[in-house]
């Protein structure tokens, strides 16, 4: 599906080497002040270019087509496009008839019987620029509720952060949360890039200001929706909320978040219990695999099933988790915005405040 969300729905379209990518954000409430400078600043965080990312240079300027009037949202669908301008489609001519290892080439072809080989087409992470734009609109809405979402890179390869500093991450070229390992992480990225390889990463997203009681029960739990949002990002192979997998190795007496008159005494649950927020910061770790596009000869097969060698050209990120941290932030914004709108009808008192 190309649509995400329940009450707040984002539909995206476009391919990596098409004329443009874009989205329609439906269900966004009227009256939200739209800050286009903030929107572009968010796009610039994800924008390609630089020695730690792909050298493909795109302006990533968002052209708003509808849903905004005199600086405020109108309540109608917000339509927008982001034009592609720096495609090098010929770089992919040599692999148009074979399946790149680690990519969605084989699975897309198995499902649809056709695929756009130019930069991965629809499966390219280029599409995530649309999510970042939509997430920026979400942030403008969340600002009205004093909900703040921060993301950064927690680990690259085997280098893990021992401290969490979002202020530093906001200034870091690679959004690294720990200043003590940033230089080593940069060197690691350049080392794998220079050896025609890639490296994985993990990001940390923390959501502050979410009141207790946000989320749905059972099949639309808040943590389930957040996990689905993160797993829908290109290259993500795992998501943890709170302690995550560590909780399976400890005792209940160690995992439970006890309470006193001041509230919770710990936050192992990561801000969510029973699929509903408990008022504590929501903590999400998202794990990205190494970029599958590497410049090493790799065995694969072609459309006829013949064994061939894949020798890639083109421009690719040596570590997709870096820009992935920006996308993770955007997806969290969309989920929380959606859940706020859904929660408005969760009890009669909420409706009375609106209609009385």
From Swiss-Prot:
**Quick one: which pathway?**
Metabolic intermediate biosynthesis; chorismate biosynthesis; chorismate from D-erythrose 4-phosphate and phosphoenolpyruvate: step 7/7
Q: Cofactor note from UniProt? A: Reduced FMN (FMNH(2)).
Query: What is catalysed by this protein?
Result: 5-O-(1-carboxyvinyl)-3-phosphoshikimate = chorismate + phosphate
**Co-factor(s):** FMNH2
Task: Name the domain of life this protein comes from.
Answer: Bacteria
Enzyme Commission number(s) of this protein: 4.2.3.5
Q: Which keywords accompany this UniProt record? A: Amino-acid biosynthesis, Aromatic amino acid biosynthesis, FAD, Flavoprotein, FMN, Lyase, NADP
The GO terms describing molecular function are: chorismate synthase activity; FMN binding
List this protein's GO terms for biological process: amino acid biosynthetic process; aromatic amino acid family biosynthetic process; chorismate biosynthetic process
Q: Which Pfam families match?
A: Chorismate_synt (PF01264)
Q: Name one GO cellular component term.
A: cytosol
Residues recorded as binding NADP(+), renumbered to this chain, are 46
Q: Which Gene3D superfamilies match?
A: Chorismate synthase AroC
Residues the entry annotates as binding FMN:
122-124, 234-235, 274, 289-293, 315
Concerning its family, UniProt says: Belongs to the chorismate synthase family.
Cite the HAMAP family for this sequence: Chorismate_synth
Summarize subunit and interaction data from the UniProt record for this chain: Homotetramer.
PANTHER family given in the database record:
CHORISMATE SYNTHASE
Concerning NCBIfam families, the annotation shows: aroC, PRK05382.1
State what this protein does.
This reaction introduces a second double bond into the aromatic ring system.
* Name under which the protein is recorded: Chorismate synthase
Species name: Campylobacter fetus subsp. fetus (strain 82-40)
């Amino acid at each position: 599906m190309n649509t995400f969300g329940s009450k707040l729905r984002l539909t995206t379209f476009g391919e990596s080497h098409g004329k443009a990518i874009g989205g329609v954000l439906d269900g966004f409430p009227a009256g939200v002040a739209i800050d286009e400078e903030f929107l572009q600043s968010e796009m610039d965080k994800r924008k390609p270019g630089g020695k730690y990312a792909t050298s493909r240079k795109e302006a990533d300027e968002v052209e708003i087509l509808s849903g905004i009037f005199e600086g405020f949202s109108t309540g109608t669908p917000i339509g927008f496009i982001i034009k592609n301008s720096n495609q090098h489609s010929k770089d992919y001519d040599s692999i148009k008839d074979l399946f790149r290892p680690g990519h969605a080439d084989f699975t897309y072809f198995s499902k649809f019987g056709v695929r756009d080989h130019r930069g991965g087409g629809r499966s390219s992470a280029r599409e995530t620029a649309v999510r970042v734009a939509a997430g920026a609109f979400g942030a403008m809405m969340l600002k009205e509720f004093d909900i703040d979402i921060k993301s950064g890179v927690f680990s690259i390869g085997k280098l893990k952060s021992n401290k969490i500093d979002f202020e530093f991450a906001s200034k870091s070229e690679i959004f690294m949360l720990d200043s003590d390992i940033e230089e080593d992480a940069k060197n690691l990225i350049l080392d794998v890039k220079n050896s025609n390889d890639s490296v994985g990463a993990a990001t940390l997203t923390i959501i502050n200001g979410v009141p207790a009681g946000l989320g749905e029960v059972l099949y639309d739990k808040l943590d389930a929706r957040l996990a689905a949002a993160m797993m829908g990002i290109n290259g993500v192979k795992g998501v943890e909320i709170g302690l995550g997998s560590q909780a399976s190795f400890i005792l209940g007496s160690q995992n439970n978040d006890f309470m006193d008159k001041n509230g919770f005494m710990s936050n192992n649950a990561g801000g969510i219990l029973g699929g509903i927020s408990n008022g504590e910061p929501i903590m999400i770790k998202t794990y990205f695999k190494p970029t599958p596009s590497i410049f090493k000869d790799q065995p694969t097969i072609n459309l006829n099933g013949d064994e061939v060698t894949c020798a890639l050209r083109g421009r690719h990120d040596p570590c997709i988790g870096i820009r992935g941290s920006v996308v993770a932030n955007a997806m969290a914004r969309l989920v929380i915005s959606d859940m706020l709108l859904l929660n408005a009808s969760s009890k009669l008192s909420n409706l009375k405040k609106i209609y009385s």
